[in-house]
Amino acid sequence: MNIVETILTPILLNISQTDKWQRDFLIELFKTLFSRQGRFNFENLTRYSKYNELTHRRQFSKYLDWLSLNKSFVDFNSGVHIGVIDCSFISKSGKKTFGLDKFWSGVASQAKYGLEISVLACINVTTGKVTFLDATQTPSGLSKKEGSKYSRTDFYLEQILDCLKSLPTIVYYVADGFYAKEKIINGLTSNGKHLITKLRSDANLKYLNEKPRLKGQRGASRKYSGKVDFKKNGISDLSKWILVGLDEKYPHLTIYTQKLYAVNFDRIFGVVLLLNTKTNKYVLLASTDTKLDARLITKYYQLRFQIEFIFRDAKQFMGLNDCQARDENKLDYHFNASLTAVNIARKAIQQDEIYNKSMNNFMRYQYNRKFAETIYYKLSQNDEFDLIQSIWLQAPMWGNLVT
């Protein structure tokens, strides 16, 4: 049995609302996706799959609970997990594709015309292993301004809230500075979750007044004892900050922490200041959980960048940018299938040392196996052909990289 079947069969049997026909199609889809050459689109899939183009189009229109499927790759009992959310730009030309709009491209460092997907993943804090969970395409025409009736911020929050019930053990969600919005913060905290994010370098923050109330003092006590003063070359005064020490992973970073009132959010954050001793520049991280240790806030935010490796593998190996469909449902199916394929491939690489922990070797092995099987089944019709077991076992290893 192919390793893809070994991994997927028990997982798909536990997912509700999937029949045998859909399970068989998914197994064949991922086997084809791993063993193909060229783009991940309907026309090219037909060249390598036993299903025709019409079958692929019909199946891509059907609903599938991708979150339940991908949750099966996570052992939530193996340690603390954090949620990570980020967006990825997808290049797409034309005028009729659903969701076409101007979105930010990190590679180009500017807004470009194309598609965008909002991706939710989880990371094991102990091992640093990241697992894709769910992807949703951002619709076009949504306002970028937070004060609008329904903006992109509302859409991103909606995706997170839809997944919360399925992820009860995840308490902390980590996102970059774009997600430092009042709606997202309030949406998470009202559901018993916390957000760790990045603040602007000139964030409007105030120190809390920790002085005891004087005997016989009239009126209410002062809540705050002054504004945090930021200068162009760094923070001017660190005397009111608590020195935690050097970062374990990056010794040139010094960690300071303090509980501060954020004026724009009207709430108290546990704020971490990371001071780069080489450049004298700093970064501000914030957590809605004011009791969370500063080192953990730093570690969780550093782990956030693991989601970029999912985007890298999906675009480089799994054809994330290759979809030729224009329909909303087909696009959603393609994006989730491409990102789910990364989970399956990593699971296979973890189980078998033959791939040398290399995604490139895994893809090459699957293609070579498919190629060798095709030749064998064609030649096996001839009675004079005998399979040499040693050569057959070596065939899928052609061209593998050695680590």
Language model region names:
Residues 10, 14-95, 222-227, 360-380:
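Electropositive nucleic-acid engagement tracts
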Residues 44-47, 106-170, 263-284, 291:
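Electropositive, glycine- and tryptophan-enriched low-complexity nucleic-acid-binding patches
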Residues 45, 79-93, 120, 173-180, ...:
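Short, conserved catalytic/metal-binding motifs centered on acidic residues
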Residues 55, 60-129, 133, 244-247, ...:
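Active-site-proximal, Lys/Arg-enriched surface segment
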Residues 79-84, 377-403:
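Long, charge-rich low-complexity segments
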Residues 89, 228, 294-325:
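Short amphipathic alpha-helical "interface-anchor" segments enriched in bulky aromatics
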Residues 141-270, 356-360, 401:
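An internal, acidic/charged active-site-proximal segment
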Residues 322-376:
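Basic, amphipathic alpha-helical segments enriched in Lys/Arg and hydrophobic/aromatic residues
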